């Protein structure tokens, strides 16, 4: 059975997401994937340079010292920190931690995740620089 009634389709512009701050931030957060791709490509380039010997590795180090690459890597770091912050804020919503019959608030979980991140970062830097 077919109908002749025309369904109402509400018009929607391509910039609908720009009207609400929540959606704008969501798009920025999802956009952090682009700098992550950049970092992945640079890392793979470094692995290939390491594989091909000292001369290739020296070229890779020279590439990393280029001011444009340094700026892109700083943008990538900022994007990674933003993405990490949003995931750490999401974690307490996904896990209900109950201590002595009461649900724990999100602050201790978020702070704990940042502490673990800082400790792991310091350990990795210590091993990389002084071991």
From Swiss-Prot:
Alphabetically ordered keywords of this record: Cell inner membrane, Cell membrane, Membrane, Transmembrane, Transmembrane helix
Source organism per UniProt: Klebsiella pneumoniae (strain 342)
Segments passing through the bilayer: 30-50, 61-81, 110-130
Compartment(s): Cell inner membrane
Origin superkingdom: Bacteria
One example GO MF annotation: succinate dehydrogenase activity
Function noted in UniProt: Two distinct, membrane-bound, FAD-containing enzymes are responsible for the catalysis of fumarate and succinate interconversion; fumarate reductase is used in anaerobic growth, and succinate dehydrogenase is used in aerobic growth. Anchors the catalytic components of the fumarate reductase complex to the cell inner membrane, binds quinones.
A Pfam family the protein falls into: Fumarate_red_C
InterPro entries attached to this UniProt entry: Fumarate_red_C (IPR003510), SQR/QFR_C/D (IPR034804)
GO CC, one annotated term: plasma membrane
HAMAP family reported in the protein's UniProt record: Fumarate_red_C (MF_00708)
Official protein name in the record: Fumarate reductase subunit C
Gene: frdC
Description of how the protein assembles with itself and partners: Part of an enzyme complex containing four subunits: a flavoprotein (FrdA), an iron-sulfur protein (FrdB), and two hydrophobic anchor proteins (FrdC and FrdD).
Membrane-related topology note: Multi-pass membrane protein
Main location: membrane
Bridged cysteine pairs (disulfide): none
CDD domains per record: QFR_TypeD_subunitC (cd00546)
Similarity section: Belongs to the FrdC family.
Gene3D superfamilies assigned to the protein according to its UniProt record, in alphabetical order: Fumarate reductase/succinate dehydrogenase, transmembrane subunit (1.20.1300.10)
């Amino acid at each position: 059975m077919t109908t002749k009634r025309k369904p109402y389709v509400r018009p929607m512009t391509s910039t609908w997401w720009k009207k609400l701050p929540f959606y704008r931030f969501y798009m920025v957060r999802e956009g952090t994937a682009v700098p992550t791709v950049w970092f992945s490509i640079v890392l793979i380039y470094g692995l290939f340079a390491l594989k091909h010997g000292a001369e290739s590795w020296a070229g890779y180090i020279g590439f990393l010292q280029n001011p444009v690459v340094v700026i892109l890597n700083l943008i990538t770091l900022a994007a990674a920190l933003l993405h990490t912050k949003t995931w750490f804020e999401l974690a307490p919503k996904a896990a209900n931690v109950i201590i002595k019959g009461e649900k724990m608030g999100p602050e201790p979980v978020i702070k704990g995740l940042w502490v673990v991140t800082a400790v792991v970062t310091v350990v990795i830097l210590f091993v990389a620089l002084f071991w």
